[in-house]
Amino acid sequence: MDKNTVVGFLLMALVLIGFSYYSSQQTSQQNVTTAPTNKNQPAHDIQATPTIQDVDTTDLFANHLKGRPNVITLQNNKVKVYVSTKGGVISKVELKEYKNQQKTNVVLFSEKTASIDFTLRGKDKLLHTQDYYFTPTQISDTSVTMQISDSKGKTAFRMKYSLKPDNYMVDFCISSNGIYPYLNPSTKTLGIQWKDRVAQQEKGFMFENQYSTLTYMEDGNETRKMSETETSEENAEKPVRWVAFKNQYFSAILIGYDMFTDAHFKSTQEAEGSGFLKDYTATMEIPFDPSGKKDITLQFYFGPNQYRLLQSMDKYSSDGSELGLENLVYLGWPIFKWINRYFTIYVFDWLSQLGLPMGIVLLLITILLHIIVYVPRKRSYISSAKMRVLKPKVDEIARKYPNQEDAMKRQQETMALYSMYGVSPMGGCLPMLVQMPIWIAMFNFVPNAIELRQQSFLWADDLSTYDDIISWSVNLPFIGNHISLFCLLFCATNLIYSLMTMRMQRETMSQEQAAQMKVMQWMMILMPVFFFFMFNKYSAGLNYYYFVSLLIGALCMWYLRKTTDDKKLLEKLEANYRANKNNPNRKVSGMAARLEALQKRQQEILEEQKRRNNK
């Protein structure tokens, strides 16, 4: 059988995250929003005003147990970060340059569905930052310090947030003073619990959920990700450098420069239609100096999963080290990752900078890839063509050895024939293997390219999700609630390509081989139907790439067939035959020699078995 089609077929199957008085005078200059209080509220009211009733007066920060939640807004040209006085933590993050399905800013983190809590071990109880109302100080458009202190102001716990200009990175520093006498003597770490119920941002739940996962990097730069499809829970085996709450195109990342320890992660699947993808929880410890001599240095990243952008975050790391955040963008197994990293991304970035529509960019990349593999494709076709013109001679050998017990002799003589004419039966297969890494690399690249998000092309209004040319309200098994036109075109082209391939196969096969291939041929015809149910929910960009790639492949096959002169090819093979026949010292080498040796060995084994059976 022709190995080209089998390899190509298997390929397509694969290819199946109060104010001081001074601040009250500066209120008009600060970016402070208060909810739900009056806008004209004096700034000094922002400080949590405790009431005697219901306040635990034994608490170290008892004067901060009561108050009103207020929000400080930090922003640059890319992101808006809301820091709440309740808990002193980030309560909401908006990305200014990206819109959701409702055409409003993407909200990557919201207090309605997410929380961050830091825990200290007191002498007789745990102190949770989420229980306190912090006082904001040192406020600017891009930074704020949240503080709680005892009634005398001698003991304090602070959290400072600094938003970098033109960046998605937030520097986060935790400091304290005079707190040591009030803590458990064994305290050496600060507890962290981060939760986030990640909202669905894209139109297609299945496709977005498939590329959303809790991911973390352990010491040694080893990135691990939890299951994308199942609820899972695990403990990190090593100290953790960073943890990311990731959906398909955006991530919220917490980076620790002293390494998180005792890290425990949980990812819970959400139901389709709930508006959420997964519920993430990260529970960790980080080294803490109770004496206050050393601060805790952390960073947040709230932004898109864009490979080059994540890679550039290394230069903004607090200690100047490599972060490896680009590992969040899955580019495939090592060989496919290498192709995407050093070829696909470079070409994609270059074409994108030309201002072309993303559909044209994908088309040009596909054409370029086909140009690269044209030479091995042509060699593959010529190898099949040689076998086609020699088919009458192969049929003669089949008639010479019609019995099944002569199958080995028939095969040996056929291989000898190919050898004399200078034809390699594997010539059509091996060159095709060169194409496999490229096709699979593109399969991994396209669904992770945020550049395709909300980019329209032809009838598709968003190449990052399905192009529903027809839709309905009921969610049907296997097909969902829509039909993707690019998926239909891909499957139709797949069928045409399969029929062309089968026709080429029949031209090189004997009658016996053709009979044996009937089941495989029916599978190839039914495969496009299987692909339709499999890829109908996939992104329009991916189906468009498959459609264009197969269409170009079919056109190349048609062109090669039209430009190949069987008569001249046979004359060339006859010349090879005469040259080899007149060269008694000719030696078979390479794959043909190995196949010949294997067949001789098989023949020896069969003859040995016959002798034993006759005894």
Where are these regions (language model features)?
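Juxtamembrane extramembrane loops of integral membrane proteins
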Residues: 21-103, 146, 150-152, 588-615
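Generic detector of short, locally flexible boundary/turn motifs and exposed helical patches
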Residues: 45-51, 56-60, 136-141, 259-266, ...
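Soluble non-transmembrane domains of integral membrane proteins
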Residues: 71-324
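Helix-loop-helix
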Residues: 1-41, 83, 172-175, 186, ...
